């Protein structure tokens, strides 16, 4: 009787061991199946993404004003051989930003085969003349290009900057420079007016004696404090009095508080 019970115990123990082994084998097979499935899906997805269906067919440029769409697309170096998923958007942005007239570029994918480029442009407002060349400057003192002729470009000449070289794609001032801050402030005021208030020249050699030129009239600003109020005073006089606007020579001094001093010949 004891022998039979012992044998039955061994059988039960053996059955339990076999069940445990079977469960382990099942788990291993299941794990292998999951890994294989993931690998297969990954391969299929990769092959799918590399399919020509996802090659770039359309490049759309938005918010460009003065720069031609074709020029932006060319500088982006995007071709119809580029896969939309494998296209390096940072490289595309850097390529586009090599154009000095572009302040910023945002590139987005639009499935299945479209790239959208949003452009923010720099605006040409000033110029500096040196060695019979014209350096086009934006409101932040950034050199946009060098030209031999600026005919039909409504720009304000900047005098009084002493610098040996001007390099396209680089700023003419260091960050925080008082002249840079003034040019940016002036730009925000005159850019809102037709023809830039018709200001032809701004002289910033002496930042305590800033002067503007309107036709034949010199506008003496003094320092850059209360610039908007000083400009309003000067141009209120100019717009109200034809004899001043048409004078052969003269000046309006708004560098101090109180009524401006006006002199014409």
UniProtKB/Swiss-Prot annotation:
GO terms for biological process: FtsZ-dependent cytokinesis. Keywords: Cell cycle, Cell division, Cell membrane, Membrane, Transmembrane, Transmembrane helix. Residues 1-33 are cytoplasmic. The chain crosses the membrane at residues 34-54. Its main location: membrane. GO terms for cellular component: cell division site; plasma membrane. The keyword Cell membrane applies. Residues 54-122 form the POTRA domain. Residues 55-265 are extracellular. It is a single-pass type II membrane protein. It is found in: Cell membrane. Cell division protein that may be involved in stabilizing or promoting the assembly of the division complex. Belongs to the FtsQ/DivIB family. DivIB subfamily. This is Cell division protein DivIB. The gene is divIB.
